[in-house]
Amino acid sequence: MTQRPLPTKDRLIRTAAQLFQRRGYHGVGLSELLAEAEAPKGSLYHHFPNGKSDLALASATWASDQMLRLIAASFEPAESFHAGMEALCGKVAKLFDKSGQWDGCPISSTLFEGPDNATFRAHARHLFEGWITEGAHHARRFGLADPQKTAETMFILLQGGWMLARARQSSDVLRRLPEMLPRAD
């Protein structure tokens, strides 16, 4: 059975997410993006009336949704918050290795390196708060004393860990992150 190709809009979003993650917002040209997505020239503005900036917001949302699913898949079967963090960090480390050990955070690479505008910053804040909210949900589920603080610590460890892993070109940094999270379980 052959798979149906993704609709053009989805191909544009996924391709943009990958390219922005690799080279940042300003490092990706529209011609290259359209060629990589195998999309006709008019399709970008058909699906994203404001062009590259609308596509950047959509691609960051798509990437964030992938991370939210990864957080949920790591914590839902876990028996403790620490076990969920171990699972999450293991999965993130595998993604790091698969990415070639250089790609940045898909949201930071897109929204913080994009146009200097309040819309991009507000969108990044909203997406990151979603990760923290998901982490706090699981911290609360495991009865941790300060779920918000625990989730913020998780977020900071993941973001900082990814940066250090990039600098060291080693996913070991990511695998060791759970050791740095205070244990309460």
Identify the meaning behind each predicted range.
Residues M1-P7:
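N-terminal intrinsically disordered/low-complexity leader segments
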Residues D103, S108, A145-L164, R176, ...:
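Hydrophobic alpha-helical segments that form the core
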Residues I71-Q101, A151-M154:
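Hydrophobic alpha-helical connector segments
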Residues A87, N117-F142, K149, E179-M180:
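Amphipathic alpha-helical packing segments from all-alpha helical-bundle domains
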Residues L95, E113-D116, H137, F155-V173, ...:
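Amphipathic C-terminal alpha-helical segment
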Residues R11, T15-A58:
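Helix-turn-helix
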Residues A56, A83-A87, F96-T119:
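Amphipathic alpha-helical segments used for helix-helix packing
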Residues L12, A16-F20, V92, G135, ...:
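Short hydrophobic clusters on alpha-helical segments that form packing/core surfaces
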